[in-house]
Amino acid sequence: MRTHVVQRGFTLIELMIVVAIIAILAAIAIPAYQNYLIRAQVSEGMNLASAAEPAVWEYVAAKGVYPPDNQSAGLVPPTSIAGRYVSQVKVTNGQIVAKFNSTTANTSIRNETLVLSPVATTSSITWYCKPSTVATKYLPSSCRE
């Protein structure tokens, strides 16, 4: 008398298909996540640079010209305005430049700069992102216009 043994489990082909599907999903997800991380780091630079805007505006309102440096604008030295991914925020003739850290920032933006440039009218200053060394795809939407 013969008994039939029912084999259970996955075959090698089924396992290979599952591994291939996971690899395809990872190939799509990892670059998207890397872009997300870089954009978050650039946002830190934008936030730190934007925090210096009121000081520049106050200087322009009081003196009628752009401040030549951080000290003139009433800000701390450039390296004292820093974050995890930003090494300094420097004011130069009204422009605010955030420089990304050479060690902690993603390699795509290390030592790159984000520049906010002012355009003054009689009652306000409008800030524009000037072309910087950061790739456009990583910039906030307000800088891509």
Per-range role (PLM):
Residues 7, 25-28, 37-43:
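Residue-level signal for short amphipathic helical patches enriched in basic/charged
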Residues 16-31:
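Alpha-helical hydrophobic helix detector
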Residues 12-15, 25, 48, 116:
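Generic leucine side-chain signal with a strong bias for well-ordered alpha-helical environments
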Residues 61-145:
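Periplasmic/extracellular, small/polar-rich flexible segments of pilin-like filament-forming proteins
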Residues 1-13:
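N-terminal leader/signal peptides at the extreme start of proteins
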Residues 35-73:
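Conserved hydrophobic/amphipathic alpha-helical signal-anchor segments
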Residues 14-17, 38:
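Internal alpha-helical transmembrane segments of multi-pass membrane proteins, especially GPCRs
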Residues 3, 27-30, 35, 54:
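Short, conserved catalytic or interaction motifs in soluble domains
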